[in-house]
Curated annotation (Swiss-Prot):
Enzyme Commission no: 6.1.1.21
CC terms in the record's Gene Ontology section: cytoplasm
Protein name as annotated: Histidine--tRNA ligase
NCBIfam families: hisS
Gene3D superfamilies: Anticodon-binding domain (3.40.50.800), Bira Bifunctional Protein, Domain 2 (3.30.930.10)
Lineage start: Bacteria, Bacillati, Bacillota, Bacilli, Bacillales
UniProt keyword annotations, A-Z: Aminoacyl-tRNA synthetase, ATP-binding, Cytoplasm, Ligase, Nucleotide-binding, Protein biosynthesis
Main subcellular location of this protein, as a coarse class: cytoplasm
Amino acid sequence: MIKIPRGTQDILPDQSRKWRYIEAKLDELMELYNYKEIRTPIFESTDLFARGVGDSTDVVQKEMYTFKDKGDRSITLRPEGTAAVVRSYIENKMQGDPNQPIKLYYNGPMFRYERKQKGRYRQFNQFGVEAIGAQDPSIDAEILAMVMHIYQSFGLKHLKLVINSVGDFDSRKEYNKALIEHFEPVIDTFCNDCQARLYTNPMRILDCKVDRDKEAVKTAPRITDYLNEESKEYFNQVKQYLDDLNIPYVEDPNLVRGLDYYTHTAFELMIDSPDYDGAITTLCGGGRYNGLLELLDGPKQTGIGFALSIERLLLALEEEGIEIEEDEHLDLFIVTMGEKADRYAVNLLNDLRHHGIKADKDYLKRKIKGQMKQANRVGAEYTIVIGEQELEDGNIDIKHMDSGETDSIHLADLVSYFENKKEKQGEK
C-alpha cells in the first residue's frame, strides 16, 4: 500500500468543515480591515528565497524543497509567503497604484523539510497578511491589533503579545558587532548552528533553543541599547498606539525573527494556557521589512506583515476545548421505493439543487428502514418517501426528522415549500 509522505496529512471531510469555517471567518475579518486576497504560485525561482529570506537562515540552509525543472532552472516549493507577495508587488508594478499602502492577504500551502512534531508539518497551510507601501507606526499598530482580533474572534484566551524592535539597518550593524564581541570568546562551547551564525547572522543566536547556550544569551547585549534615535522613536510610537488601543503587550529584547528581512517592529503572539501544561506556544509571528523590496530589485518601499499556521490555530482551539460552529445539515433526504421512484428522484434532486436546496438520496438499493437510518446519519432535516402511490397521485408527506411532525403537500410544491421555510427563517 502506498502511504502518505512523512510530514503531510489528509484533511478528511469531518476536518475540512472546520477548515472552511476558519478560512471563511478569516476572509470576513480581512474585509473589515480592507485587505484584498492575492494568490501566488506554489513554486518560485530558488533565487527569490535565497535573496529574500536570507542565505544564512535555517529555512534556506536546511528546510527548502528545491529541484531542477526540465529547463534546468532551480525551482523551490514556497517555504513562506512574504517573499512571493513582494515579488508579485514588484513584478506587477503595484507601487504605481494610488491606493497605497497595498493591503494584501494570502492563504495556501507552504513547504519546509522540518522534523515532524505536534502542530507542525512539512506541508502546512499558512494564512498571511502584508501591508506594503507605508512606513508609519499606525499601520504597525493596525497589524498588531488585527492579530489580536483574529485569535480573540475564535474565542481564544490567555494570549500574550510579545514585541521588540530590531532597529533599522544602521542599528543592527552596530548591534551585530557587539554580539560578535560578546559571543566570540565562548562560541566554541555553543551548538553547531550558533557557531555557523556568529559571523553571518549573530542575532539568531539569541533565539537558540539549546539549554547550554542560554546562559551566555542571558548576559548578551540588548538591542534596545543600540537603537538609534529614529528607531527608538518609531518603536515608542508603535507602543503608544497599542496603549491607546488598550492592547496589552510584553517587550522582549531577545525576540528576533528567523528571517533576515525584518527591521524595526518584530512580534510574536503566544498562548499561555493551562491546557498546554504550562508550556508557552507561539501561534503567530511577523514584523516590518524595510529593505526587502530593494533586495529583490524593487522600489524603495517598506512593508509589514505576519503569518499564522491554520494547523496550529486548529490545535489551539482543540486544546482549549473551543467547538467550531458547523452548519452541515442536509435539507432533505429522499427515500424511494422501486426503480420508477428512484429514476424520478434523480430528476427531482437535480431540480431541488438548482433551487439551492441541499438534498440527497440512497444509492445502495437499501430497504426503507436502511434509507431512514442513512437520512439520520447524514443529518437530514426532512425526509420524504416516494413510491408508486406518490408518483400516481402526486401527494407526499414531508417529515421533520427531529420533531416527527409531518406536512402533506403536492410533489410539485416541494421547492416552494422549502423556499417559504427559508424566507420565514430569514425574517426571524
